[in-house]
Regions:
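Short, charged recognition helix plus adjacent turn
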Residues: 68-78
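DNA major-groove recognition helix of helix-turn-helix/homeodomain DNA-binding modules
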Residues: 51-66
Length: 78
């Protein structure tokens, strides 16, 4: 099993959230969480539970793989 880099994960979530123009509170509300939970992800204090990965990725406009790898994957246009 691969270890998730909490720092990279948090920075990626924060970047994606800001690109979408939503606050921590708005993201938390859409996931039925507190804004403190989102803050903890973004400050590398914790990572979301596995059951939140799909809805989180959907809200941030990335795949679960991209979310876990903390980077966008190249798109093939072929």
């Amino acid at each position: 099993m691969t270890h998730i880099d909490k720092q990279a994960f948090g920075a990626f979530v924060a970047t994606l959230r800001k690109e979408k123009g939503i606050t921590q509170k708005e993201l938390a509300e859409r996931l039925f969480l507190s804004d403190k939970a989102v803050s903890k992800w973004e400050t590398a204090a914790s990572v979301p539970s596995i059951d939140l990965l799909i809805p989180l990725a959907d809200l941030l406009g990335v795949t679960v793989t991209e979310l876990l790898m903390c980077r966008r994957m190249e798109q093939d246009n072929a």
